[in-house]
């Protein structure tokens, strides 16, 4: 895996950007394969945090958070612009691969755009689909009144027992090594320090109530019908981490985004680490992932096996990407050129189904496509010459062929295993 990534990074440095429509594909590759279908699982783009006056976030700092261009938890104007760029890129890429013709109007069976019924997800899908097929008249499918969580995207626990809780906590604690959750919390010392000084947390109203940072107060709650939950310092500082990340993307002045602090890119990466670890703890323990991702795994499997489908765009949340990847056994990764290392804002897991022309055999390539931190901040236009970041994903226990693809049978079987893992939960 490390060797493959090293080669990929080296090639990225010496080859023109146009080569990287999705992942580096040679002329020989295109002579051998034809793109047949694409299934995308996307995180919504930039939203506003819950940082209004009187909120828990407002009490953690003496400073004033950014005046957002949208209501709390809704897609911002900049988020819409960035998602439009992504849709434009995917349009250029799929046309270049011959999956669609320029300005094609697809049949209802060929393209499926389906969003969770939260405003930020519906809006993200709308911006993407308009740019992806500007004359295609695509409809964003969502099943409930905004803003309501759709059960397909809602990462709630639907099976909870004493045995489940014990196994889940065993797997969660293993993430921190011998020290368990305390070890995980201590790995965030620098992150907490950067957040605390940027917030002026010791002078805040919240500090009077919560006191100093603690490393032994993380409590996990696993309740049927609810998302995995957390209480303690990590939970509180995750809220601040999330808000800072979004403010860093949204606010053109980096010093202003940091409330006047002079933060380096490494400092921002450190701040974002809290959110990455928080997501790992709540959604990536294998038994938890199999539980909360079950409906979405079934839906994605059906889309990959849909006879007439050419393109599927599913818009949800970082918890959806994290849990689906964990349930499928995707190997751990750390993304380059991003302060968010696992599921950056607007990121997309892209399943590409390729047909081997000589045999008709189907193969699948899986990549995580995302805008770099610089691309997000600069509203950088995206096309085949100015592509987003593309990071190839790998699955534990599966081997790619010489062209970097898995057989479709391998991927189908892995989805089947992940779906069946839910039935094994007692």
Regions found by a protein language model. Give the residues of each.
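Bacterial Sec-dependent N-terminal signal peptides
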Residues: 1-24
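Signature for phosphate-centric chemistry
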Residues: 22-110, 116-312, 316-426
